[in-house]
Structure formats: C-alpha cells, structure tokens
C-alpha cells in the first residue's frame, strides 16, 4: 500500500494575492514528505518550489506554500499547476488550480473577484451508448462539448462524477456541483 494515497491529499487556496496554498497530506505512517510544485501539465518541466517536512507520529503533514506571481484558475483561463509528493519510496502526482471563490449581495458569485454567472447543465454519469463505465476520452469529450456550447458549470445528476470527468473539468474550465448520491436520509 502506498504511503500517500491521492485521496489523502487536500489542497486549499488560502489567498490569491499573494498566493498561498495549503497542502494537507495524510501518510499511512510517519515519514519525510517532499512536495514539489511545477507549472503546466507537462511533466518534463522543472519544479520551481520544493518543500520537505517530517510527518507527525500519525503520518500527517501540513505545508503552507507561497506561489510567487501565481496564475489564477478561472472558467475562461483554467491554469493548472502540477505537484509531486514523495513519501519514502512512494510518489503521488496531480494538478491543482489557484482561485478564490466569494459570494456577496451586490456582486453575487465571484471567481478571483470577477462576477461569474453560472450557465449550467445537469449531467448523468453515463456516456450514452458507451454505458455507465468511465472512459477518460468520453468524459473529456462530454465536458468539451458543453464548454463549446457556452456552459461553464455542471451538476452531477444523482451520482458523483468520475475522477476523469473532474480532471477534465479542471483542465477545460468547468465548475462542478458534485452530487453525493440520489438517496434520502
């Protein structure tokens, strides 16, 4: 079992100007954790931030990272950073965007201080004739077609979105309301 599973990494934008990003990493055991951050989606680029810290006795680490001259994520410009987390011999990678969400009575919903009108659609987890299985290319196509039609938001109807669909939304600039389940408690 990997020391750091992707679902055990929480990334939060603390503020955008200057940009501070908090990484909360939950390892399976105490170890030294190294975090590297790079620009864009190409893994051959150099990582420009490297931080290391020893985890506590439960394997938990929190790192607050300042990102100089940060490029912000928005629906119109979905800029993503890459991260690589090393814990012992295990490596976990992924992407994240830096953005600030706010709501107020005058402007409504804002991304990075810019008023944003949601133009959304409810989508089901299936891919038509392909069925309910997740195919990354089909998920990307679904998001791309919605984006090209003028949508900037989706709500998953009755089931959670697949990881592939959420990743496509991050890359293409689609906001998501990810429904937990179609069930009353």
Predicted regions and their residues:
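Secreted/periplasmic carbohydrate-active enzymes, especially glycoside hydrolases
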Residues: 1-176
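Short gly/pro/ser/thr-enriched loop/turn and capping motifs at secondary-structure boundaries
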Residues: 183-185
């Amino acid at each position: 079992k990997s020391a750091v599973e992707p679902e055990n990494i929480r990334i939060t934008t603390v503020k955008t100007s200057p940009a501070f990003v908090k990484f909360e990493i939950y390892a399976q055991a105490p170890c030294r954790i190294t975090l590297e951050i790079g620009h864009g989606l190409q893994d051959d680029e150099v990582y420009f931030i490297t931080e290391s810290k020893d985890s506590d006795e439960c394997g938990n680490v929190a790192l607050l990272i300042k990102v100089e001259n940060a490029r912000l994520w928005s629906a119109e410009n979905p800029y993503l950073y890459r991260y690589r987390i090393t814990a012992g011999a295990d490596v976990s990678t992924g992407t994240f965007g830096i953005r600030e969400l706010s709501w107020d009575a005058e402007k409504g919903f804002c991304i990075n201080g810019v008023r944003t009108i949601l133009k959304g659609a409810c989508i089901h987890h299936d891919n038509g004739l392909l069925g309910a299985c997740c195919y990354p290319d089909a998920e990307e196509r679904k998001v791309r077609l919605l984006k090209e039609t003028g949508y900037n938001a989706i709500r998953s109807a009755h089931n959670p979105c697949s990881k592939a669909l959420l990743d496509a939304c991050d890359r293409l600039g689609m906001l998501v309301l990810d429904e937990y389940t179609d069930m009353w408690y």
